[in-house]
Amino acid sequence: MRKKIVAVLCAAAAFLTMSGCKKAPPGTLTGISISYSGMCYDDTYGFSIRNDPVDGCLFSCNYKDDEWVELENIPVEDTHWQEALALAEKLGLESLPDEKKNSPGLFITDETLVSVCLIYKAPDDEIIYRYLDADGNTRSTLRDFFEDLAGQLQTEGKRGDA
């Protein structure tokens, strides 16, 4: 029985390793929510991006009916944040109703961007929401988020390899 358990655990570890996903350590950024209403997980005028705490992948998703609805999955590596930022740009416009869109680009709309919410997982598993002032520099905020997250995951991976 013990050998079967070990075999299953080894297979799961091998799958996660091959998938290119790395688990984010506690206390790091695990998500970002972009909102035009001031609420985290805005269903109507916003979208969310999170780093899944289970398999360590970056999910672009909407939060509806108290659960995440996955739209796309990007393994988080140091070169992937640009790809995720481009996807964030796309989803930022797609998440708005047609009448709210007035030009291409990141969150360019006649609606005022009210909040950028960073989501953290604390070492004690508490979820912490930190709202940033939305000052029109959202692209920079997103870029910094992805760079920081990629750096943290890369550092964690190196610590695990040592």
Tell where the protein language model's regions lie, with residue ranges.
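Positively charged n-region of N-terminal signal peptides that target proteins for export
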Residues: 1-4
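Sec-dependent N-terminal signal peptides
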Residues: 6-12
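C-terminal motif of bacterial Sec signal peptides marking the signal peptidase cleavage site
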Residues: 17-20
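A short-motif feature that recognizes glycine-rich, charge-decorated loops
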Residues: 60-96
